[in-house]
Amino acid sequence: MTTSELPEHLAKHEVRYADHRQVERDRLTPMMQHYAEVKDQHLQQILLYRMGDFFECFFQDAIVVARELELVLTSKEAGKEVGRVPMAGIPYHALDRYASQLVEKGYAIAICDQVETAAQAQGPLVRREITRIITPGTILEEGMLQARRNNFLAAVVIAGEHWGLAYADSSTGDYWTSQSTGLEGLTQELYRLQPSEVLFPSAAPDLAGLLRPGQSKPQQIPDCLPDSFCYALRSPMPFELHEARQRLLEHFQLRSLEGCGCEQLPLAIRAAGGLLDYLGETQRESLAPLQKPRTYSLSEFLILDQQTRRNLEITQTQRDGSFHGSLLWALDRTMTSMGGRLLRRWLLQPLLNPEAIRNRQAAIQELCQDGRLRQDLRSLLQKIYDLERLSGRAGAGTANARDLLALAESLLRLPELAQLLSRAQSPLLAQLQQVPPELEQLGDRLQQHLVESPPLQLTEGGLIRSGVAIALDELRQQVESDRQWIASLEASERTATGINSLKVGYSKTFGYFISLSRSKADQVPDHYIRRQTLTNEERFITPDLKERESRILNAQTDLNQLEYDLFVGLRSEVSHHVETIRAIATAVAAADVLAALAEVAVYQNYCCPEIRDDRQLAIQDGRHPVVEQALPSGFYVPNSCGLGSDRGPDLIVLTGPNASGKSCYLRQVGLIQLLAQIGSFVPAKNAQVGICDRIFTRVGAVDDLATGQSTFMVEMNETANILNHATARSLVLLDEIGRGTATFDGLSIAWAVAEYLAREIQARTIFATHYHELNELSGLLKNVANFQVTVKELPDRIVFLHQVQPGGADRSYGIEAARLAGLPSEVIDRAREVMSRIEKHSRIAVGLRRGNGSQRRTQASPQQIDATIATEQLGLFSGPSH
């Protein structure tokens, strides 16, 4: 940053330097010299430098912080020859609030804190050190995290078409690795995880700071990695296989990574080791305890690509990205933050293993049938705090006394939880029937040591109960005795001096004092020593008062230090139990999710789907889980669906009017399949669900302005992805393929796509369309059936019945939809006239039927039909008749 880039208002401060690198160090004050030395080591982070009650920023960082946080940008003297330099500051007690804003904007922050008091300082400066670096993916502070979603840090290693991925949430201890082939799979995993920060090894000589979302990526980052994430380029050395493996073995005290499942996965090891190195560098002494890395394969879970997650509105709505109206919104009845995070993960990573699915179903079934157990469980869960993050902060050494009390209260609820679930039969609930006794003992110890309402600050006393430590009680008794002496001093001095207005007071600057009005100053005894003169007041001390003050202050300092030491001991004790606490927390979170899904199932009248090993999808009276909750009770019209059985079709051509509910029906089927594979009950009267390997959706499209792609090109890219990756075990939901181009081109593409899905792939497919000519496919291919969303025609209007029935529609009623939208009557009348002419002259359906009755694989091409009717198109849009 040059001098010319200084904000104009700093000119009045005669500020000349905007960058600390512009200034010769020996011209700076000692404090500023130290600041510059620290900043040299952290050029890529914003440096927050503790000065008393504030964290200050200087030079270029001050300008950035003032701009991003909308703070006052002022200046500070940095040396006689340097003059004033830019400065901005935030109160130390508001660090979390301001730091979270900077992190959300994609900045990394280096915290340079005071590690000794002014009284402890040996030289002219209080010692300051970098205590931790906060980046988007390494946040531990409660106030900077979203309670009900994970904050993942990811690391990626790519070798050709092969890739390794590691991700961790340092606040909860989750640590996972994977390795696979095909960069598309890596892209989709990152979209699923939504990491706050992605690490990528680079040999570039200048490793820039964080690349914020939307910034142009350097050439070192492959195009397959989405622009919507925050990236940190890292030195390749920590990602080298030998170094990464050794770091993992040493950190987790292992002889082999076989137990972690990644011993034979070199790219996964490299990613995991590089991630661990970054956490150690940024968190310093506050490195949160991580679980041993666990390895998973993409083939273990149903694959949902980003397009499908968006179209099915799993965690946010498609229209405005809000939580309200999403599937997660409709299902989330969890009582704990841990449960909320786990439910989100279950929804984004459905299972393929039928046995695992049935285990979840069994627990939900039991909780549905035993309403008393379900309600008691949910009431008890409501009293349990976030065990994962509380124990994580304790392990990292950042937990305060209130954190430990919340942890203690939660641990003491566990025996009650075990007793409640003692009669549970399902394996997932039964795993909470035994709670390690040491956790209850730890909870008791914490409650016995900590006061009921401790302060947030840890160094100002008031943390530990009386009776815990003899030395602590003796110090408190001494301080209390001296304070009582001071409290009685005012009365005794009034009697001794005869001055009834005499008062005893205290200030942080001058300590204890005797206060008199200036009019009484000539009446003070000889042993009073003047300490301060104010406008209307004189302040004095006495030798005895000075001695007592010194005793109180020294004893209070010792008292505060002793309380802090006792607290740190308690916190350290908790850190030794983090692994056990988190194991229990995992089971508690699962019980919470299962109870929440049971609650939804009971109140929304869901059924338990039969999980099948074949391809059958049979839904009787299915409902959309979100839409039905948004409507008054009983208003939602249920619909059935049958796909993939010996008697049923593989592909349904779904026709019907605009706004009749076709898209809702598609999403309904997709969500029921997804819910079944997370082990949930589903909104239907009855359901038989065959395991699905992928769900594909193409519902609506818009221009992609960022890549210069039109609506039609976006649609074709999405369709190509489906045709290239779908299998016979996939579920494909397509809406309006081919509508983004000319009518006959669109019909040609729609016909060919539907035919390919039914004949070649034989994926279970619902193909919603306004091309009624596609109804002819059912006469050509045995595994295609026609269904329509019905309407009731009245003399002056139509009524949407929202019922899906066998048969193909021959009208779309688009003009009726336009009329309902409020188009002028002249436009509606003209549209009807043009429609009449088009219907009279069209030969498309006739041409398509030429193939009917012949071999299944032959039919007239839509291009031939185009040529046949080309001449008939002339004159269709001549002026209206009079």
Swiss-Prot record:
Entry's Gene Ontology BP terms: mismatch repair
Superkingdom of the source species: Bacteria
Residues reported to bind ATP: 656-663
UniProt xrefs under Pfam families: MutS_I (PF01624), MutS_II (PF05188), MutS_III (PF05192), MutS_IV (PF05190), MutS_V (PF00488)
Key word Mitochondrion present: no
GO molecular function, one term: ATP-dependent DNA damage sensor activity
CDD domains linked: ABC_MutS1 (cd03284)
GO CC terms, sorted: cytosol
Cysteine pairings via disulfide bonds: none
Keywords carried by this UniProt record: ATP-binding, DNA damage, DNA repair, DNA-binding, Nucleotide-binding
Alphabetical list of InterPro entries matching this protein: DNA_mismatch_repair_MutS (IPR005748), DNA_mismatch_repair_MutS-lik_N (IPR007695), DNA_mismatch_repair_MutS/MSH (IPR017261), DNA_mismatch_repair_MutS_C (IPR000432), DNA_mismatch_repair_MutS_clamp (IPR007861), DNA_mismatch_repair_MutS_core (IPR007696), DNA_mismatch_repair_MutS_N (IPR016151), DNA_mismatch_repair_MutS_sf (IPR036187)
Family the UniProt entry places it in: Belongs to the DNA mismatch repair MutS family.
Reported function: This protein is involved in the repair of mismatches in DNA. It is possible that it carries out the mismatch recognition step. This protein has a weak ATPase activity.
HAMAP family reported in the protein's UniProt record: MutS
Protein name: DNA mismatch repair protein MutS
Organism: Synechococcus elongatus (strain ATCC 33912 / PCC 7942 / FACHB-805)
Gene: mutS
